Amino acid sequence: VLQKTAMRGLNHWIKLSLILIFIVSLAACTLDAQTTQPPAPHLGKSTLKQVTLESKKILAGQTIYVPVYSYIYHYDTQNQVINLATTLSIRNTDLKHPIIITKIDYYDTSGKLIKNLLENPSELSSMASADYFLSRNEVSGGLGANFLVEWVAEHSIFEPVVEAVMVSTESGRGLSFVSPGKVLKHIGAKTPA
């Protein structure tokens, strides 16, 4: 009798444990579904305002090279690759003045222009950010892809932060890294560091 009572108690705890595991699994699926929502509509390119550029008013600016990776090799062979989604981020760090972005070009490994991402000069307000996204299926840039970003300003300003973030969550593995931009050329007065 004691053994039967112990078995019933054990079966009860097993059932409760299975129900609890099911509930936790269901909650995890719901949480995962929430993380795949599209970004808010106010993010990205919508923070830019098209402007007419008057070159005589330009006081400072830069041309910035930003290395990006469409994919990377893994394991011990170049036959195995992980595709990466890329976000180019341009952040105006000046507290008072806007910058004007004049060029955002995307190049492949051989230095061939793939596409111009900016049609017209566009103003980025003080402390605002703009981003450009390339999906993980966009592999035409190759391992040595890059962006060339040009910006100018009508005031002496703090230089913007321009960088690329590469991400992959392929096969349940999370991989991400940042690639900072490198200034190739100063236009006009050098900006404060």
What are the roles of these predicted feature ranges?
Residues 25-28:
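C-terminal motif of bacterial Sec signal peptides marking the signal peptidase cleavage site
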Residues 38-42, 138-192:
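Terminal connector regions
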Residues 112-146:
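Intrinsically disordered, low-complexity Pro/Gly/Ser/Thr-rich segments with frequent PxxP/GP/PP motifs
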Residues 30-32:
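Bacterial signal peptide processing site
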Residues 80-87:
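Short, solvent-exposed loop/turn segments enriched in Ser/Thr/Gly
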Residues 5-17:
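Bacterial N-terminal signal peptides that target proteins for export
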Residues 90-97:
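Asparagine-centered strand-capping/turn motif at beta-strand->loop junctions
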Residues 43-79, 176-193:
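Transition segment at domain starts
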